[in-house]
Design a protein with these regions (language model features):
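N-terminal active-site segment of His-dependent metallophosphoesterases
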Residues: 1-55, 68
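Active-site-proximal beta-strand elements of phosphoester/diester hydrolases
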Residues: 2-10, 116-122, 246-247
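Residue-level marker for buried hydrophobic side chains located in beta-strands
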Residues: 5, 34, 61-62, 117, ...
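Active-site environment of divalent metal-dependent phosphoester hydrolases
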Residues: 12-14, 40-42, 66-72, 126, ...
């Protein structure tokens, strides 16, 4: 049995199937970890979501920002833009089943036997892993209960941008969601900058990748994440010294779709079909 962590798919179903062929995926013996953003912007979001759901216990998923956008759009809380490719999901016969399944996925997943934790974007440098797990559960429980609509209506926004134990209510939950699904760069004091999406090393000097912040409290935890399609183009790519494993390699943007085998940390990649469009 092997376990593979796969980066952002965003509806690139053909590339996903090519990647599974590349790793000789065996549904009975292997397990797939998906680092969020299963859907949106790519051409086959509905097929992708149906397939991953069909994998059952062979798949572990964490929610990404595009997955949350789909959930919000399904409740008419967020508009669908011209760039979105989720309308086919919302009009599908099994839309409710798919959305309900997605809502029950976690924001953070840990396998203590394998020694890895997976999130979509990152973890606030000020948080311990136990703290991060508790905050993930806090928001996951809301996504799965009757308070979800109010939660989704208040989920969007860039403030507060720095953690404090005194933050309460929707502001607190918004910060938690932004860390798990949107974070890339921080200032030295841990304030989030959610606008900058460049490769590490190309940012202004006042910003630091979240995982490279001095005294990050999860430095001893192996963390898999996606979200950052440009991260491997940075001037520094020695991620292991930070104990992080970024698996988004920009498939949607004509890059690659990548899987890391957790057993030996070997990387497998296939070329994006989007580069041929």
């Amino acid at each position: 049995m092997s376990t593979y962590a796969i980066g952002d798919i965003q509806g690139c179903y053909t590339e996903l199937q090519n990647l599974l062929n590349e790793i000789n995926f065996n549904e009975k013996n292997d397990q797939l970890w998906f680092a969020g953003d299963l859907v949106n912007r790519g051409p086959k979001s509905l097929q992708t979501l149906r397939f991953i759901k069909s994998l059952g216990v062979s798949a572990k998923i964490v929610l990404g920002n595009h997955d949350l956008h789909l959930i919000a759009a399904s409740k008419n809380i967020r508009p669908i833009s011209n760039k979105d490719t989720i309308k086919e999901i919302l009009t599908a016969d099994d839309a409710d089943e798919l959305i309900n399944w997605l809502k029950s996925r976690p924001l953070l997943f840990t396998d203590t036997d394998l020694g890895f934790t997976m999130v979509h974007a990152g973890i606030a440098p000020q948080w311990t892993m136990d703290t991060a797990k508790n905050f993930a559960k806090e928001c996951e429980s809301i996504l799965q209960n009757e308070k979800i609509d109010d939660f989704l209506m208040h989920m969007y926004g860039d403030t507060p941008n720095i953690w404090s134990d005194s933050i309460e209510g929707y502001a607190r939950q918004r910060f938690i969601i932004n860390c798990f699904t949107r974070i890339r760069f921080c200032t030295i004091d841990g304030a989030l900058d959610l606008d900058i999406k460049v490769a590490p090393g190309s940012q202004k000097k006042s910003l630091i990748p979240w995982y490279a912040l001095p005294n990050r409290k999860t430095i001893d935890n192996k963390i898999i994440f996606g979200h950052w399609s440009t991260i491997h183009f940075g001037v520094e790519n020695n991620f292991k010294k930070y104990n992080v494993y970024p698996v988004d390699t920009g498939c949607l943007w004509g890059g690659q779709l990548t899987a890391m085998r957790l057993d030996d940390e070997k990387i497998f990649s296939v070329t994006s079909e989007q580069s041929k469009l």
